[in-house]
Amino acid sequence: MSVNTFKYIHFAHYKDIPNWSVQYVVEEKLGFTKKYPMAKIGSFLKKSKNQIEIQDDAEYKQVTVKINNGGVIARNDGQLKRGSEIGTKRQTVVHAGQFIVSKIDARNGAFGVIPDDLEGAIVTNDFPVFDVDSSKILPQFMVLISTTPQFVEFARKCSSGTTNRKRIDINMFLMQSIPLPKVQE
């Protein structure tokens, strides 16, 4: 991207900007090692489209993601919830090994991998779930990268909304490049 630099102003040509937000143009580099090739997160994470309609007479296990790399756990201490008590009727079914993001708490390091005991549980659209291309990256490595202070700061910068409801821009998240060693390493 060609950028003309003046004392107080930076100019970039629109055709050279992959994301038209001012924040993207002036974002700080995350400072990851140059030892490995960089890859966009969207090149190995694909959003799950496994959505269901909640049935009032069925029971469901729900998922939440703890902040500060605290893990992915069952909501309500693992108690099942009747569909009639669930307000959002369209939800996503999760599977073990998928990567999950809390849109609201990504700025606080709320990323994780669905554990085996939450197979088949559900989440709202505020928790995007991604299938991981394990031929390119291990889900645990993505958790490691996404909970570094630099990455959490990136998540904070690309979150917008009112004070306690700032949500990460998932498109910016998927466009972010990270170092990607070979899976064998």
Feature-to-residue mapping (PLM):
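Alpha-helix initiation and N-capping motif
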Residues: 38, 60, 139, 148-152
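Sequence-specific dsDNA recognition surfaces
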Residues: 39-54, 65-96
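Well-ordered mid-protein domain cores that form the structural environment of catalytic cofactors
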Residues: 106, 147-153, 157, 177
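A short beta-sheet element
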Residues: 91-92, 96, 100-148, 161
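Short coil/turn segments at secondary-structure boundaries
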Residues: 54-62, 157-159
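A short glycine-rich beta-alpha junction/loop motif
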Residues: 107, 121-128, 160-184
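A broad, structural micro-motif
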Residues: 36-39, 137, 168
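Non-catalytic DNA-recognition/assembly elements of restriction-modification systems
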Residues: 1-54, 179-185
